[in-house]
Each structure stands twice: as C-alpha cells, then as structure tokens.
Amino acid sequence: MLLQLRMRELSIDLFSISFLSTITSAIGSLATPFWGALSDESKSRKKILLIAISVALVVLPGYTIAKRAAHFFFVAAIFTFFSSAFDPISIAIFVESSKLNSNAVVSIVNAVNSLGMGMGRIVISPLLNLLSVVHVMLILFFVALTMLYFVQRTAVVPHHRYEIQRTNLQRVFSAITSKSVLKKKNLWAMYLGSFLRQLGIGGTFALIAVYLVEEVGMKKSATILLASANSLMQVPSHFLAAWMMRKVPSKYVAAFGMLTSGLGALLFVPADSTLTVLLAYAVSGFGFGTFINGATGFVIENVPVNRRAEFLGLLTSVRSFGSLFGPLLAGWLATFSFTLVFVTMGSIMIFGSIVTWVYCQR
C-alpha cells in the first residue's frame, strides 16, 4: 500500500500502479520454483536463503529514489526475484527442523508472518501522520535489515537432497511438468484453485489504497490502519486452520479459505464507512489463513520429500501468476467501476473454491 500511495504522490496513473503488481507477480511466478528447486539440490538451504535476501535488501532502498513508473518497475523486478527465495526455503527449513506436525509448523509460521504484517501496518499508520511516505519506507528498510541477523543465526539442518542436477531453466519448470506428482490426488486442482484465489485477491487489493482515499474519502493513515485488520485476522485463522486439519482433510480447509476470501472482496462493494471497510478486511484476512494452511498442508502431504521446497515454490509461483493477471484485470475494470472490480474478483475466488472442493481428492 505504501508503494501505491507513493506512486500516486508522483501522479503516476492507475494502470501503471496496478501494473506494478503484475510485474512483481510475473517475476515471482518464475523465481519461487527456481529458488525452491535450487535449495532442494543444495547442501545448505540457509546459504541460498542468506545470499538471496542480502541482494534483495541491497536493492530495496531503490523504491525511495524512484520517480517514474519505469523506475518502480525496475526495482520491483530485481527485488522480487531475490526476495522470492524466502517463502519456499523458510517453510522447508521450519518443517525439517521441527519435531512438531508439519501442519502445526506451517500454521505457526504463517501466524507469525501475519502478526508481523499486522503490527507493521499499525506502526505505519501514525508514522504517516508525522512523516512522508518516503521517510516511512526508509524506516521499514532499516527494520528489514535485522532479518540478516536472524537468518545468519539459523541452524543448518540436513535435508533429503534432490540428487539430479538441473539447469536453471529446468529448475523453473520442473515442478509444473511433473505430471505424475500433479495427478496424485489431483494436486493440480489445488494449484488451479490457488491461482484463481490469488487472481481475485490480487485484483481486489491492487488499487485498494486509491479506492479508499479517492472514492470512500479516507485519510492515508486510516487506510493503512484498517488494512492491519486483514493481517491480524489471519493470526487466529492460522490456528483455526491447524485445528480444522486435524478434523477434516486439508483440501476442505483450503476451499473454505478461498470461499471466505471471495466473500471478503464482495463486502467491499457496500463498504462506505470505517466499520464496513474493517469488516471486509477482516473477512478477507480470515479467508487467507485457512486457505494458505490448507493449501500448503495438501502440497506437503502429496509431494516427494526431496522435492518439498520445489513444490512449495510452485504453490507460491501459481499464486504470483494469479496476481499477475488480477491487477491487470482490475486496472481495466476500474475504468468502468470499482464495484465491478470487487464483484468480478469475489466471483473468481468463489469459483476457485468450487474447483478445489470438487476435484482435489481426500
């Protein structure tokens, strides 16, 4: 949201703002399976993660000096490529280093991520009343630097390595072409449902800051504060998902999350006050927690152990691929009506939940 606000300050058009999300999604969709596959082959996942995050942090301050849309696109492309290593590698490290059930580990990790995002938005909101968007971005950069310390302290955990050496191109596309794995319990349907859910959510939030400021009439600081409800609501939903997966198959948990995400998008249609916007954010956040835990659990249950990070990377990849098209579609639909944006995106996510529910096997 800070990038949306900064680009709007520079009088950059709505389509370019939404196109930034498309660029990050396109790069992320290719980068995440690459980093996951590379870490599966590597002796040390930690080393790969440390190198990638270090480069990403070097590039991150570039956002503060960007003046044109092309500048933002350039910084986003490089930053996204290297930062895409974090999700698949970190999840694999946590699962392999913990004695807890993998579903419990994933829920805890996701809850911590959501709590961090929620607290970040709560902190950012008052800062925007005191400082410029650029100064707030610089503060967040210095906070992000502390990540290097914690990654460095991560233990090197032995893992089942994927012994076949592949080219970089093969690392990118190996998972998506593994038909035997994707057909197991119709794993492909989970990836398709995740793609549709992310297409919808990416379109819903691609221009949300602009919508709340220019259409609803909210202050910039208020939009950030209300957005924290999305992340904070994810925290209990992560733990609820872990409990649900002990009772029902993970595919149902994921489908429920997709359905709830769709309802969250639809709630933005009548939202015209602080309370109604807060409700829409909260429902959407609740949907994410159950979706991501169910989807991640289903993937872990149905892929080879020595290709775990690769297929977790593919999950992030298809979600990024969905975010590639979502903002583009939203940018076009917004020229007609923001209501059309939210109705379309909500409907797409609900359809994704139906695909997952019907085709994924228990």
Language model features: what each stretch is:
Residues 1-25, 188-193, 198-219:
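Helix-loop boundary and gating motifs at the non-cytosolic
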Residues 19-37, 228-240:
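Central cavity-lining transmembrane alpha-helices of secondary-active solute carriers
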Residues 31-44, 128, 237-249, 334:
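Helix-to-loop junctions at the C-terminal end of transmembrane segments
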Residues 47-61, 252-266:
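Structural signature of the two symmetry-related core transmembrane helices
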Residues 77-113, 298:
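Cytoplasmic helix-loop-helix junction between adjacent transmembrane helices
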Residues 135-152, 342-357:
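Symmetry-related core transmembrane helices of the 12-TM Major Facilitator Superfamily/SLC fold
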Residues 157-192:
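Juxtamembrane intracellular "pre-TM" segments in multi-pass secondary transporters
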